[in-house]
Design a protein with these regions (language model features):
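Short, low-complexity N-terminal intrinsically disordered segments enriched in polar/charged residues
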Residues: 1-16
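Acidic, glycine-rich catalytic/binding loops that coordinate metals and/or anionic ligands
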Residues: 196, 223, 228, 253-314
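Short histidine-centered loop motifs in beta-beta connectors
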Residues: 210-233
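A structural signal for short beta-strand/turn segments enriched in small hydrophobics and glycine
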Residues: 175-177, 227-239
Length: 314
């Protein structure tokens, strides 16, 4: 009979350094790539600096679950992934870095899609935003679409089966097309194109010397050209899976320079003053963006953690 594991059980085992119990609940593959001695050291380092943990989100989709905790001092965070067999297939324990002086956009923006979407990566720390560790992507967000608890219907190896694939991408604010890259094929979901990580993308120049980037666009779907003036909400292309993308989604960021290598991202000011983060579902209706917190679902990337992620120094 399958043992039922819940959030309280997991975090209690982590806080009490119950290494053997945790290791016994790893999937077979996770055990193969994880040393029990490393796990013991990681837990010891983590518990030496953490505060009192509180469950932040419980997300589940495609028969996988993710639990996320932060401590009351916001100094540490934990993420644990479970598969449909209640086996642990991923564990992340990180100190929370608080970077000061991050600038906010002066321009107000909408999300670049008019369909309801789900924030898979987004926020101001690396536990809920994978991009945070990279200066030129730090405040970016990734958007997917979930229907009936799934990101796709049918064969997960086909881009066309993902709910967000092919949907219209719209301009997030008025601006001028600064740059377009096109002609890069969509990848098979789960197979990343690391040679062209952004895939097909567009850079739009807005007011206040701000730029937006939308990446992983479907090839040959652009409706506009370099130099065109855009209005907020204008259809500019369609969602694809080009570049370093695990499955069809929208990568969106606002930045202070058009050069993607040296730019710094800005904290996006959205209409309605919302601040979407991982686990939020967003709906865009003209001037309004509605946000729903604590949605009971999330996307599980194909290349899920293959080992314990930790940044604690022993």
């Amino acid at each position: 009979m399958m043992e039922t594991i819940n959030a309280q059980i997991i975090i209690n085992k982590i806080e009490n350094n119950e290494v053997q119990w945790l290791y016994n609940h790893f999937s077979e593959y996770f055990q193969d790539v994880t040393s029990i001695n490393d796990l013991e050291q990681i837990l010891s380092n983590y518990n030496a600096i953490r505060g009192q943990n509180h469950l932040y989100r419980h997300l589940h989709i495609n028969r996988h679950q993710e639990y996320i905790w932060f401590d009351n001092k916001m100094t540490t965070g934990v993420s644990v992934f479970l598969n449909k067999y209640q086996e642990i297939i991923g564990m992340t324990l990180v100190p929370i870095k608080h970077i000061r002086g991050m600038k906010q956009s002066k321009q107000y923006y909408t999300i670049p899609i008019k369909s309801k979407c789900f924030v898979y990566w987004g926020g101001d720390n690396e536990l809920i935003n994978y991009h945070y560790q990279y200066k030129n992507q730090r405040l970016a967000m990734d958007l997917i679409k979930v229907e009936d608890g799934c990101t796709y219907n049918g064969d997960s190896n086909q881009c066309e089966n993902y709910h967000i694939y092919g949907l219209p991408i719209v301009a997030p604010a008025n601006g001028v097309v600064e740059e377009i890259v096109d002609g890069i094929s969509d990848s098979i979901p789960g197979e990343m194109n690391t040679v062209h990580p952004e895939g097909n993308y567009i850079v739009i120049k807005h007011g206040h010397k701000e730029y937006s980037l939308i990446a992983h666009i479907k090839p040959h779907s652009f409706k506009i050209e370099k130099g065109d003036e855009l209005l907020r909400g204008q259809h500019i292309a369609n969602v694809g899976n080009s570049g370093n993308s695990s499955e069809p989604h929208i990568h969106f960021q606002v930045m202070n320079d058009k050069n993607l290598q040296v730019t710094q991202t800005l904290k996006i000011q959205f209409h309605n003053n919302i601040a979407p983060v991982k686990g939020d579902e967003i709906t865009y209706n003209g001037d309004s963006i509605l946000i729903e917190k604590e949605q009971p679902f999330s996307k599980i990337a194909k290349n899920i953690h293959t080992n314990i992620t930790h940044l604690f120094k022993g």
